[in-house]
């Protein structure tokens, strides 16, 4: 097992140093123990050893969807640093991609585009590691991982064994899966099914279609689709840039709320009473007859504009995108959570709609 890896400043994230160097929010206190796993066997062994010792365990990927308490984590952290990509033709113009969990996600997407494989390009620019994508059922610009995922190799912490689980058995839903709500399995590698030929997945997202000057549902050059997605994400502060505090975030902090069919009319009426009957409420079909609303739209209409609460705030909404809560350089996790509560409670008070956090909260809560 490899030893503790240095942080950006060369310090270990144990003792008095912080896990902040391993999260895109740059927040979080120290860990009691920290190891780096550079291959799947080491990763599995590190998890087994922590479990055998009865230690609390945090498996750390890219830290892009993580909010860690200021007090830190009083257990062992295993940082995933496994590498490896494999492409196998399976016939009919289809290619299976196998990626180790520690591969940087955007680098994986870039390589698929370089090879002319369509499917993942709309997920360009999303920070984090590949192993996290099925856990969150990562999605953007009209595409979700669930549409392309074949299977994952998991370490089952209950038995200590490694097993392959098909995508359909992972309970993949909007921004979630059975893996997100249980700590009993660790993703070791992931398999996707992609299409050869240099064309993108059908362009479904209206904003992306306009950017590409493409008809909704059409396919475009896969490289052009990737560049358009990256440009859109940069405009919203959603591509990591150490010099831009708008990217010191966990991405979208709240998921888009999903409203049951029986409740939709009452919810829309309440929103209309607040914003005016002539304002169109963005809504999108979800599973089982439900409707997805836009969290960003609700946040803005509840009075929380870009950059809230304004200059001087240590934690602020991004100046580019209201759905991102950001660290302006000197924030604490407590600052961030205070802002999150203010926004969540404000939307609930105005519209009766509950916003749920998307990141994983480690030893802290809203």
Swiss-Prot record:
Example of a GO MF term: FAD binding
Top EC group: oxidoreductase
One GO-annotated biological process of the protein: regulation of cell shape
Known pathway: Cell wall biogenesis; peptidoglycan biosynthesis
Sorted UniProt keywords: Cell cycle, Cell division, Cell shape, Cell wall biogenesis/degradation, Cytoplasm, FAD, Flavoprotein, NADP, Oxidoreductase, Peptidoglycan synthesis
Cofactor entry: FAD
InterPro entries per UniProt: FAD-bd_PCMH, FAD-bd_PCMH-like_sf, FAD-bd_PCMH_sub1, FAD-bd_PCMH_sub2, MurB, MurB_C, MurB_C_sf, Oxid_FAD_bind_N
One Pfam short name: FAD_binding_4
This enzyme's EC code(s): 1.3.1.98
Main location per the UniProt record: cytoplasm
Keyword Flavoprotein annotated: yes
Ranges where the FAD-binding PCMH-type domain occurs: 27-197
Catalytic activity: UDP-N-acetyl-alpha-D-muramate + NADP(+) = UDP-N-acetyl-3-O-(1-carboxyvinyl)-alpha-D-glucosamine + NADPH + H(+)
Function of the molecule: Cell wall formation.
Family assignment from sequence similarity: Belongs to the MurB family.
PANTHER family: UDP-N-ACETYLENOLPYRUVOYLGLUCOSAMINE REDUCTASE (PTHR21071:SF4)
NCBIfam families: murB (TIGR00179), PRK13903.1 (NF010478)
This protein's name: UDP-N-acetylenolpyruvoylglucosamine reductase
Organism expressing this protein natively: Saccharopolyspora erythraea (strain ATCC 11635 / DSM 40517 / JCM 4748 / NBRC 13426 / NCIMB 8594 / NRRL 2338)
């Amino acid at each position: 097992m490899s030893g503790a890896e240095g942080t950006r400043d060369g310090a270990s994230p144990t003792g008095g140093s912080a896990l902040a160097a391993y999260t895109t929010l740059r927040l979080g206190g120290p860990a009691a123990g920290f190891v780096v796993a550079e291959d799947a066997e080491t990763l599995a062994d590190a998890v087994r050893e922590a479990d055998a010792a009865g230690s609390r365990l945090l498996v750390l990927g890219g830290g892009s969807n993580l909010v860690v308490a200021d007090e830190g984590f009083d257990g062992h952290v295993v940082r995933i640093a496994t590498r490896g990509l494999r492409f196998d033709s399976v016939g009919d113009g289809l290619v299976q991609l196998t990626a180790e969990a520690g591969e940087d996600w955007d680098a994986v997407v870039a390589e698929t585009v370089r090879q002319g494989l369509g499917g993942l390009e709309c997920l360009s620019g999303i920070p984090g590691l590949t192993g996290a994508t099925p856990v969150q059922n990562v999605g953007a610009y009209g595409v979700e991982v669930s549409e392309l995922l074949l299977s994952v190799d998991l370490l089952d912490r209950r038995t200590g064994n490694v097993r392959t689980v098909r995508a359909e058995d992972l309970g993949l839903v909007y921004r979630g899966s059975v893996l997100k709500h249980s700590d009993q399995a660790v993703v070791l590698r992931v398999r996707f099914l992609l299409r050869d030929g240099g064309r993108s997945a059908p362009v479904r997202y209206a904003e992306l279609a306009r950017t590409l000057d493409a008809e909704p549902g059409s396919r475009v050059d896969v490289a052009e689709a990737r560049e358009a997605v990256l440009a859109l994400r940069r405009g919203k502060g959603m591509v990591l840039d150490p010099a831009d505090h708008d990217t010191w975030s966990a991405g979208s902090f709240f998921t888009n709320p999903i409203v049951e069919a029986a409740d939709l009319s009452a919810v829309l009426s309440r929103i209309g009473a607040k914003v005016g009957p002539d304002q169109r409420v963005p809504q999108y079909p979800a599973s089982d007859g439900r409707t997805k609303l836009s969290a960003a739209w609700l946040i803005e209409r509840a009075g929380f504009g870009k950059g809230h609460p304004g200059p001087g705030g240590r934690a602020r909404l991004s100046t580019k995108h209201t759905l991102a809560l950001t660290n302006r350089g000197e924030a604490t996790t407590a600052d961030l959570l205070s802002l999150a509560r203010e926004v969540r409670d404000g939307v609930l008070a105005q519209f009766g709609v509950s916003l749920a956090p998307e990141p994983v909260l480690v030893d802290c809560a809203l």
